[in-house]
């Protein structure tokens, strides 16, 4: 059965707020009615006017209080053969973060996918690792993951033995296959994530078929939807502030408003008119029975002012007005979804926070809170860092430990010597003793083949360039420079 946070109380509209917040009060009143009377199936209520979130928080749809839709939907059609994706470009941000540009035949465009590599990626080059996909919100950018821009995801996963997969882009897409192109984009995200990308991750980037998926807001909705539409594909699925009902009363109209506000898209081109069966065929609530056997984590705040919100002059209300309404909507649909899982005897973890709006600090917290459950589902519950600084590297590490951080791996063999990985870089043996390679230069060194590549072993630590405008590492057969203007360059 679902496990719940026992310290949470239902939210309501009992505070007499000001006239300017009448819409929010009405929304809360409707939701209180749903929570009090309708967790097993609420009567439909008219949809209040949704609000859009302030940047940079990604927005979720702002639905009306949902009524319980039918408990089943037609299964997804058997997939037709799909040509595999193809990597057209690769860029190493660091020695542990790499960006791939993958040509998607179904979308006829390149999709950027970043990977945060597993802790032992370099130390154990013959091993494969589980994978965890992290989906973005409604306002997903085309150049960078919101997780990277707004959270400490890169640091959090450094010591974990999982390949973290970050698809870039997909604004307002719900990571699904749209019926028609819109705004110059032919969204086929489900095809990409389920069929075009996996062979690349598993054949070329040492990922196993043990997979998890998490998302915030729109990405949380998509995580549950994709897991339900593809039973068994994911071992773990998590929704942080997701909207987990698509086809209930008023929901298609609310989603239409959200995707228009989130980028000028038309949800009719996604699933068709509200009467189209596609709405139910993608509804996590309707598809809940398909999640049997998947480890589930569902969380939301309640829209009340929390630790990461700025209080307004209205009691209990944050200044992030749109984030208030969106999080309340997430709360209600998440509770309805949890009740549906209970009805079907599907276990999971439902966490209802006593405060918090629809914004990034809360999603970063949930990412960290969900990890133990994700680790267990991915077979990593007993995984932990087990290393000491190698004696040959101790003196250099002692002098630089503030920058390098703690060790992640024991030392291991590389062509012509050995290396050891730390939180913020690596130490290699070399002709002039152990040397540090880190940051963007460390990424370029991996791209150049590392100690066994064309540059050979390092001859220096990273140091200022002669003109003082950048940084440089010297190697046996060349050097790598970095400047803020030009990035990294490999030179002879």
Regions found by a protein language model. Give the residues of each.
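Short, low-complexity patches enriched in S/T/P/G
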Residues: 11-17
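Non-catalytic cap/lid and distal C-terminal segments of serine-dependent acyl enzymes
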Residues: 2-5, 17-384
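Juxtamembrane low-complexity tails/linkers enriched in Ser/Thr-Pro and polybasic
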Residues: 7-9
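Alpha-helical structural elements
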Residues: 12, 116, 173, 184, ...
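Extended, compositionally biased repeat/scaffold regions that form elongated interaction surfaces
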Residues: 92, 382-492
